[in-house]
Amino acid sequence: MGIKFTKMHGLGNDFIVLDGVNQSIQLTVKQIQKLANRHTGIGFDQCLLIESSQTEGIDFNYRIFNADGQEVGQCGNGARCIALFARYYGLTAKNKLTVATKTTLMDLIINEDNSVSVNMGVPRLAPGEIPLLADRQSPEYSLELNNGNTVNLHAISIGNPHAVLLVENIDTAPVNSLGQQISFHPQFPEQVNVGFMQIVNHEKINLRVYERGCGETIACGSGAVAAAAIARLFYNLSDKITVHLPGGDLCIQWPCPTAPIILTGPAAFVYEGTLLS
């Protein structure tokens, strides 16, 4: 008997979601890589697995696997999908859930319009928490590239590592070439997601993201949060920022640097299926 799955997406950032509460699921790295292939598999940016939690106060364990099979600690778009998945399939009747990932806890609230608000926690800037190999914390870091040039960027953790670069025009930004170099740079020992941010006005930014283990995706929830946090901290943007990604818009609210940052956006069901092998 095969494993049932549901295809979902958040602004085009697409997933297969697996119910590990009612099914026993043990996928290998190679199996995930095969399933992620858009020509010979299902095709997705991440594989999401929801499991029962034995910890008081935590409703579910939320596990995230990139297309390369690597388990990671954060995915904001996936979190919104997990919330709707859990309620739709009767795993919970609650509209507010707490889930645990590999690295963090997340509070998820299903709103009346079926959008989901995600408490992404308090962003962290200390190099050791990102992680980034640097002598001290700084607003901006300089990385030497393969060709001998340097690039200046911000670095932040939203439960997973992010680099954010300010650009004049995201349409012409070298997202794949430069994004890959930065993502695999040895100063980021766990690799890094790379956001290319264009400030539109006091309340809006445009963003493209190169995700570690995936390449460029048309939406990245944690990347949107990382960019909005950097914009608020270092470029004096509003406490409520609209992040425009190729897949659509996300709303980020951050009242102050010591408060949790909140991501709100949609999630959608696409189809159900069964993994046969």
Curated annotation (Swiss-Prot):
GO terms for biological process: lysine biosynthetic process via diaminopimelate. The keyword Amino-acid biosynthesis applies. SUPFAM superfamilies: Diaminopimelate epimerase-like. The record marks 162, 211 as: Could be important to modulate the pK values of the two catalytic cysteine residues. InterPro entries: DAP_epimerase_DapF. One of its GO terms (cellular component) is cytosol. It is an enzyme of class 5 (isomerase). The record marks 271 as: Important for dimerization. Keywords: Amino-acid biosynthesis, Cytoplasm, Isomerase, Lysine biosynthesis. It catalyses: (2S,6S)-2,6-diaminopimelate = meso-2,6-diaminopimelate. Its main location: cytoplasm. Catalyzes the stereoinversion of LL-2,6-diaminopimelate (L,L-DAP) to meso-diaminopimelate (meso-DAP), a precursor of L-lysine and an essential component of the bacterial peptidoglycan. This is Diaminopimelate epimerase. It comes from Legionella pneumophila (strain Paris).
